[in-house]
């Protein structure tokens, strides 16, 4: 079964990730990594550095996922982490 079919909603995906499910973590990364790389690239202007910033950002996403309260946009929450991580790079 593909990862796309394992989680019926974003809320279920986040809850599974909060419980430490590695499949949920992979799915979140696959779903958002291309958009988040674009955000990081706007700050880094170098593919290698942007990818490093994005990876550090996802480490924070998974480390802090318990602080996301399922209110508001999950993508927006991830985006804010990526922007903050990018600003720390500058």
Predicted regions and their residues:
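Hydrophobic/aromatic residues within well-ordered alpha-helical segments
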Residues: 28-32, 36, 82-85
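Intrinsic, short, N-terminal disordered tails of RNA polymerase sigma-factor systems
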Residues: 1-8, 12-15
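Short, charged helix-capping/linker segments at alpha-helix termini
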Residues: 2-4, 18-27, 37-56
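Short alpha-helix-to-loop micro-motif enriched in aromatics/charged/Gly
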Residues: 66-71
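Structural recognition of an alpha-helix C-terminal capping motif at a helix-to-coil junction
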Residues: 38, 52-59, 72-84
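Regular secondary-structure segments
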Residues: 11-18, 58, 62
């Amino acid at each position: 079964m593909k990862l796309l079919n394992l989680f019926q909603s974003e809320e279920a995906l986040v809850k599974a990730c909060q419980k430490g499910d590695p499949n949920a973590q992979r799915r979140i990364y696959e779903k958002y990594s291309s958009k988040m790389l674009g955000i990081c690239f706007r700050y880094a202007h170098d593919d290698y550095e942007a990818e490093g910033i994005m990876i550090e950002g996802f480490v924070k996403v998974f480390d802090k996922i318990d602080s996301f309260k399922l209110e508001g946009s999950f993508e927006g929450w991830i985006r804010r982490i990526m922007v903050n991580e990018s600003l720390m790079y500058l």
